[in-house]
Structure formats: structure tokens, C-alpha cells
Amino acid sequence: MSSGFPPEVLSPLLNLVQGLSSPDNTVRNDAEKSLSSDWISQRADLLLNGLAILAYQSEDPAVRSFCLVLCRRISFRTLPGDSELEVFSSISNESKQSLQSQLLACFVKESVPTVRNKLCDTIAEIARSIYDCQGEWPELINVIFNAVNSPDESFRESVFRTITSLPRLLSGQDSAVTPLFTTGLADPSIRVRISAARAYSAVILESKQSTRDQVIPLLPSLMNILPPLQQDRDSDNLADCLMAITEIAEVFPKLFKPIFESVIAFGLGIIKDKELDNSARQAALELLVCFSEGAPAMCRKSSDYTDQLVLQCLLLMTDVAGDPEDEAEELQEWLNTDDLDQDESDANHVVAEQAMDRLSRKLGGKTILPPSFTWLPRLIPSQKWSERHAALMAISSIAEGAEKLMKKELSRVLDMVLPLLADPHPRVRWAACNAVGQMSTDFAPDMQVKYPSRILEALVPVLESPESRVQAHAAAAMVNFSEEADNKVLEPYLDDILQRLLTLLQSPKRYVQEQAVTTIATVADAAAKKFEKYFDAIMPLLFNVLQQADGKEFRTLRGKTMECATLIALAVGKQRFLPVSQELIQILGNIQMGITDSDDPQASYLISAWGRICRVLGSDFVPFLSSVMPPLLVAATSKPDFTIIDDEVDESKYSEQDGWEFIPVHGQQVGIRTSTLEDKCTATEMLVCYAAELKADFDPYVNEVLTSVVLPGLKFFFHDGVRSACCKCIPQLLNARILASNRDPAKVNELWEPILRKLLDHIQNEPSVEMLADYFECFYQSLEISGLNLSPSSMEALVAAVDLQLKGFISRVQQREEEAKNGDIDIEEDEDMILAVENDQNLLNEINKTFSVVLKIHKTAFCPFWERLLPYMDGFLSGNDTVAKQWALCMMDDLIEFTGPDSWNYKDHFLPYLAEGIQSSEPEIRQAASYGIGVAAQHGGELYAEICSSALPALFKMLELPDARDEEQIYATENICVAICKICRFCSQRVQDLDKVVTYWINTLPVTHDEDDAPYAYTFLAELMEQNHVAVASQMPTIITILAETFASGVLRGRTLTRLMEASKVYLARFPADQVNSVIATLSVDNQRALSAHF
């Protein structure tokens, strides 16, 4: 075996191996140095071959195993001083062939299963490297196919283990694949059958289609492995096999279509089988749930899938109580624990909750609600606390996916949930808090607007529960409710809420204190100025926590307290905060100077806290920048923490609580520390805050932030939040430079030119639709702020990028339509599809805004470039996709608005669609078309006057629709109202019976939602009142009602509001006071207050 290998090498090599495995740190460190400097650098070929020989010759299985692991690890290390070249690639071809031969000899000889496993892993990785370099290893193929017939089951198992690691081994062996797996899946040894199942899954997932086609017919044989495992109660192997099948189902769910009903029946049988371990039952649940994500239509068509799976999920969710004899002890343990983050992810009830959430989000409310609400009304009043708990957690789980339909029945759902906030069992009350919190997020703002009293009157008393965990969860639910609540909703309850939260702040449980502080912060944020009365009582308590709560265990509490104090400062405003601001700044400065540990959570809280203080103090914060910016820049420029470990290595030092997440790659675990990514994102967001708030005062930092943080951050692909924050930072940095330099062209261009190059590159090449929208938003905001002209080459690059992205949009739309046609997806129910459509719509909106700004700056000079996109606009306008048609109409609207009469040159492309669009059944199309008619009247000149005036009958007709003022229609309705206003103002000579038309128009008011268009309507109304036009003179009660609703809505501000108020005073003064007052008396109290506040 070792023929030709220098024997004098083996002895020192064996010593090296023994040194590397020594428990003595000194011995091991010396061996590692020798490995790198003496062996890898000088004798890599002898090292790898020697390890293989020792793996063959040694009588000690532990030595053989370790040599094989070393051989694999070292082969794929990079050489010292060369970051590209791996050790295996660096050795000669002769040495490679020798190593291959030695490994195959080991394969034939090795008899210990655990060592064989290490050997297979090493062989697979060496083979992968050979194949990646277009090499071949025919001897391995021969050994593999010979070993499948070995009488030794460990040899047969090794065949499939090797194939699992490297399915490419079977490339070009199509004729032999079917017999190989037919034999393996029917092997008498369960170990071999399980190994064959894993290999089958890998081949399906990673092989070419020709190889895949050979094994697909064997899918029933794969499934046939399962029943004997269930019969034998072999839970571990059953779970392994189910996981291998799940991997196939996740990618190719439709392969199971011919046997889907059988798969459902078997999977449900496993879930029901309480004699099996939870691992097997959960694996079966995972298999069935994954079909909802990959083939929702197939699941909807099954008669049993949803009904039976929901029932089994609910039954698993009742598995929260444990054994009756242990129930009291387990409850006490649950109540007493201080570790609220303890991992329950493998508990049946948690797995089932997650399954319900996934089913709801993928199948939608129409499918998931009927079976759910068949059982929930029976579980809610159950005598068993575990069933009441399951019902509440089920409501929490399905709320997001079934949001639209559940909102319609929200009152009835609250009837089920709210009484259980007073349940005698603490875990039920905890679950009720959980449901209220989840619903407050998923059903916002309906929960806060329609049912605030019912919710708060039930939730606030739970803050006084005797159990700390229930108190904390009630406070957490209050956070969710308050985040979406108006301060008017909270005001009547603030005394009760804060009195209880301040009591919780004195709790002996630190997690209760932390939650109380967080909730106070959120309530303050929502209450805004209404929180002022509590400022003097609460701030000293928070300062005391920051100064007195010492020790590592209090770091998170202090961090949350920083958050609370600075959110309160934001809520009450600068003048109220100013007297205590220096004290808080001093406290935070001391904390910052005391941070020495890299994992101290206070550091990330400080980053945000300084940002909030900056927002409150504005330019008064500038003196503190020199202290705040250095650690902020360190965090914003930080690199991600990576590690690569082998499967055998203990992962405990890379815990999830420390922010580590791992994915398996080629037999190794690749980890990234996500907590550092979040800190980097927060730091970048704070730079946006500083630049936006301090403006010119931030200019000394602009260059450094741009070059070291923002431009590199645009391609920080590990975290989209970082890239998004960088996009938001660019316009603010430009604005800071513009203000500081008094628009000095040289200084502004110094910043703008590298930004422009980067942005044009990203909007052309970025694959993420969501990020593309951010890049376009950054582009047009930067242009708008700077007012800089684009060069012809930049205009060309912009249009070329948009051309490419529109092609991508069309492709995605076509794919969704094809999938919907085939029944693969339900675009209205599938949450992922809804999000994909929203992302595309958002992207088109941002592209439209980009062109709007470019047209506004360049006018007709941009038209030759804009014209390149006419084929897309023509296609979208004549097509049926609402999103695309709306985008094309908006593009035409901007053309009319910013090029005026010159837009007439393109009239044939859009005029028919404007006329057609104002009568569309789709509100988005009506809104875009009516806006176009309005801007044509305002900016198009005489060429458009006749067309605009002739549109009036159709416009008025659409305002008469019974649902014209419904939530989904209101913006279209208000755009039509404003379009009529513009026609009357700018095309009055073409309008027949103008006074009559204006009188009708008055009755289409008010405009209370569209803040962009409202000024046009109310400027016209003010003119009419100033002129005492007949249309207003004869409609005093109507005018008063319009004014009251307008003022109450807050839709107007600035000069338009001032002018309307002055015109209203003059107008109403023309009428007897008693007549005016009698009309006002008929208004609602809120509208009366709004009128009073504006006169």
C-alpha cells in the first residue's frame, strides 16, 4: 500500500497526528505550528498521502478516523500566503492519483462504520474538487458500483453515503442509476435503506434532469421504506427518512401529485401516533406543511389536507400541559423561570403553532378559517386549560395569513379572546395576552380605531396579575396595541396604564422591569404631547435605573431604559426635555466610556439613544458629535463575523443567543453572527438621522461617511437593511453638502459624481426587486435635492437600466399568471405572491417618481430618451395588468405635466386610454386617468382644452357610484373631484354652463385624504368664496359642512390652509350669525371643535 512512500516520513507524521489530538494545549499548539510551517508549506503532497497511509495502516480506529478528518480539512485549506490556492490543488498530479488510490484502498479495507463515514466524507470532497476542475475519477465509480453488492451492510451503506455527499458521481451513469436505487431502497438492512433514501433525495435535488428522470419513478419505493419503520416504532430512522423526503417535497412538490392522498394519509397517521417519539411526529408534520408552501393549489384540492391537518395541529397544540401528575410542578417551573428565551422550538405545541402560521400564510383565510373555526369555538369554553390555551395560540398563529377575512369578523373574535384575559389559569391568560398582541399588529388599525375601549378595559387589569410572566406578557401586548394607536385613544387610559407600569418597574424580576420600561417607552411614543404630565414623575426613576443598576446582568435593563428615556424626550419635545437634557447626556456619556466588552448590549442601545437626542435637540446636539461619531463609525464600518466549523465540532461556543446562525455547506457549518449585522444597520440608520437633523452642521463628516460607510454599504449583501439605510443616507449627505457650501458646484459635484456612477450601476444590476425600489428612490430624491442636470450619457444609462428592469417585471408577471392559470398559486391568498406583487408595484412607483423628477428638471430635453420606453407603455396601456397600466398612465401624466403642450406630440399613445380610464372599474386606473385629465387642463394649454371639457360628464358620473367614498375608492374619487376643479379653473371658456358645473362640483367635496391634490381644490373654493360666486352663495350649509370636515381631517396646511380660513371668515360674515350657528349646531362634536379651532 505504501509502496514508493518514504518510510522515514510516517513516524514523524504519526507524532504530528498525536500532537494535534493532544489534550495538552502546549503540545497541540506546537503541532499546529509544525503542521503549517513544516508540512503544509513544505511537504503538502507527503502530508496528504501520509495521512491516507496512516488511515490504512493504523490499528487504532481513533487514529484512522482523525487522519481522514485531517486529510479532508487540510486538502481544502488555502496555502499560507496564497488566499486562492487550496492545498489539494497545489500538489502534483502524481501525488493526487496516489492519494486517490490510497483512499480507495481504505474504502475496500475499512470495517469500522464510524471510520467508514469519515472516509466517505473525505472521498466525496476530494472527488468534488476533481470534478470541479473537469477531472475524472473512474476508479471511484467502479468501487462504488461493486460495493453495492457487498455482503457487508456497512459497505453498501457507504455507497449511498458517498452519493449523498456528491450526487455528481452518477453523472453519465443513467443506465445504472435505476438498478442502483431499486436495490438500495429495498435492501434488507434498514441502515442501507435509510442511506439510500438520503442519496435518492440528493440525486433528485442536485443531478441533471436526465439522471433525475431515471429515479423519479422510484418515488413509491422511497415511500415504502416508511411503514415498517412506523410499525417497529423506529422513530429516529423514521424521522431521518421523512426529512429526506421533505427535502424533495420542498423543491419538487408536484412529483408527489400521483401519490399525494397516500402521502397525506400516512403523514396524518404518523402525527396521530403517540407511541412514536415527537421527532418523528414533527417530521411528518413538516412534510405535510411544506406542500402548502410549494404546491398550495394541490393542497386546496385535497379533501382531507386542510381539514385533517388543522385538526392535528390543534391537537398537538394542546400538548402543552405535560403529564397530569407533573402538571403542578411544570406550571411552577414555568412561573418561576427567569429565562424567557429558553428554547422550546422542539416542543409539540410550538411546532404546531408555527405550522398553523405557515398554513395560514400560504393557503389564505378562505382555506384555513373554515376548519379552524369548526374547532375553535369548542376549545375556547373547554374545561381543560390546555385546550383554551391551544385555541388562543391558534388565533395568534392564523391571524396574519387570514387577516382580510378575520378583520370582517373581528368583533366576534374579540368576543372569544377578551374574556380569557381573566381566565383562572395563568398560562391561558398569557396566551390571551399573546393573541391580543398579535391581533393588535395584524389587524391594525381596526383594533385600535374600532374597539379600543373593549381591549384596554380587558387588558390593563392584567398588568396587575399575580404572576410575573403574565404581567410581562400583558405589558408586551400593550406595546403592540400602542404602536398603532392614536394618542386620543390612549389618553383616557394613560393614568391607569402608567400607574401599573410604574409598579412593574419595581418588580423583583428583571425581565418584568425590562418589559415595563419598553412598554412605557412605546406608550410615550404613541401618546406624544399627552405624555407631558407624567414626565416629571417618570424621568427621575429612569435616571435612577441608569445610575444605580450596576453589573453585567443589568446591561439590557439599562439599554432599554436609555431607549425609554430618549423616546419620552422625543414624545414631549425639546422645551420640556431641555432642563434635564444635560443630565441625561452626562449619564449616557459615562456609560459609553465604561463599555469595554465587545458584546455589551448597551452599545447598540446607545447608538439609537444618541440619535433620538439629536432629533430632539437639533442643532444644539452639534457639540456632542465629536464624542458620538467615533463609536458610531466603528459600528457602521464593521465587517460581518464569519466562522466555518466541521460537523464534529461542538457549536456551543457559537450560540444562537450570541447571534450566530449556521447553514450546512459541503459537510461543514458556515456561520455568520447576525447580531453584528443588526448593530451595523442601526448605526447606518443613525447616520441618516444625524445628516437629516443637523444638515449643514454635519458636513465635516460627509466625505468620511460617504466613502467609508455609504458607498461600500450599497453592496453589503449580507443585510438589506444596511443597503436600504445607505440609500436613505445619500440624499441627506447631499443636502448637508449643498447647504454647507451654499450650492458650490465643485463641492456638490465632488459628492454627486461617484454617487451617480454607483446608483446607475445598481439599478441596472440589482436582482432584488425590493432593493431596486430603494435605489430608484435614492436616485430621484438626490436629483430633487440637488437639482443637478443629468448628462446625455447618464440619461441613456438610466433609460437602459429601466428597460432592463421592465423586462424583468414583465417576466415575473407572466410567470405569476402562468402559475395561477395552472392552479399552482392563488395570487389573492398566497402571502408570498401578494408580497411579490406589492414589491413590483412599489418598484414601478419608484421608477415613475424617478422619471417625474427627471422630466421636471429637464423638460423636453429628456423626451428623446424617454421615447425608448414607449413600446412598454403602449403594451401596458393596451394590456390587462392593472399595476402596469396604472404605471403607464402615470408616466403619461408626468409627460403632460412637465412638458405641457409639447406632450401633444405623443397624444396618440395615451389620449384614448385617458378617456377610457376615467370610467374604469379599477380605482387605481380611474385615479391615474383622472389625474392625467387634470394636469392636461392645467398644463396642456388650448390643445387639450376641448378634450378636458368633454370629459366632464364621465367624471361626474363616476362620482355618483355608491361606493365612491369607500376606503379603496376614495383616492380615485378625490382625484376626479380635483380634475373637475382644474377643468373649471383652466378651461373655463370651453365649459358649457360653467356656473352650473361649479355648483355640482361643490357637492363633490370635501377632499380629506389626498394631501397632494387637496390644495388645488381648496384654492379654487377659496377663490369662489372670495368672489361670492353663485355656487357658494346659494349653498351655505353645504359649505360649512365641507369646511368642518376639511379642517377636522387635517389634510391642509401652510398657505392654502391660511387662505381658506381667511376666505371662509369673509364668506360666512355675509350671512346672519344665527343662520350660521344653527347649521354649525347640526354638526358632530368633532367637526364643531375643528371649526372652532380654525376661526
From Swiss-Prot:
Q: Which GO terms describe its cellular component?
A: cytoplasm; cytosol; nuclear envelope; nuclear periphery; nucleus
Task: Name the Gene Ontology biological process terms.
Answer: protein import into nucleus
Its keywords, alphabetically, are: Cytoplasm, Nucleus, Protein transport, Repeat, Transport
The superkingdom of the source organism is Eukaryota
Keyword Nucleus (UniProt): yes
Q: Which GO terms describe its molecular function?
A: nuclear import signal receptor activity; nuclear localization sequence binding
- Asked if the Swiss-Prot or TrEMBL record annotates the protein with the keyword Transport, the reply is yes
Q: Name one Pfam family in it.
A: Importin_rep_5
As for family, the record states: Belongs to the importin beta family. Importin beta-3 subfamily.
**Oligomeric and partner information:** Interacts with Ran; interacts specifically with the GTP-bound form of Ran (GTP-Ran), protecting it from GTP hydrolysis and nucleotide exchange.
Name assigned to this protein: Importin subunit beta-3
